Amino acid sequence: DHNTAKTVIDSITKLYEGLGHDDFCKLFPVILTDNGSEFSHPSALEFAPDGRRRTQIFYCDPMASYQKPQVERNHEFIRTVLPKGTSFDSLSQMDIDLMMAHVNSYGRPALGDKSPFEMFAFLYGKKLLDKLLRLTCQRVIPANEIILKPALLRR
């Protein structure tokens, strides 16, 4: 699927409903994004279908990737699996989920050599991590099984 305003709203709503109001608001008090057309309906993202505020949307300045450095670091990891020039068109959602599980299981110096998943569990608890993993079809990859190379998605 292509990212449209509707698919982004649907994804946020799925997370909101799966996490519940309190956990969603704890995890996503603010969403910082770019000015892409998929984020062109901020009120539909900020407010739940029942009208309750669930987050606040803020936009980065154009050409200011430094405003979201951790996202840019994830893009670098994605490019180790899918080098520049590689089409994303043939990727299934399962491929993307697998790749992101490997990316988010990888320890990083900026996180004290912990992975994003480990830091999440430290900050919010394993129970909430497990809930989020189920909702996003993710899983923690053991460190000795992480593959951040094109071979990860070769069939």
Give residue spans per PLM region:
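C-terminal domain-tail junction helix/linker
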Residues: 84-155
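Short strand->helix junction
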Residues: 2-5, 64, 85
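Active-site beta-loop-alpha junctions of metal-dependent nucleic acid enzymes
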Residues: 1-22
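RNase H-like two-metal-ion nuclease catalytic core shared by retroviral integrases
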Residues: 33-35, 42-48, 57-81, 89-101
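Short basic/hydrophobic patches in alpha-helices and adjacent helix-turn junctions
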Residues: 14-17, 77-84, 101-105
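Short helix-terminating capping/connector loops at secondary-structure junctions
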Residues: 22-27, 52-54
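Conserved, well-structured core segments that form or line functional sites
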Residues: 4, 24, 30-31, 35, ...
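Glycine-rich, phosphate-binding/catalytic loops in enzymes
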Residues: 48-50, 121
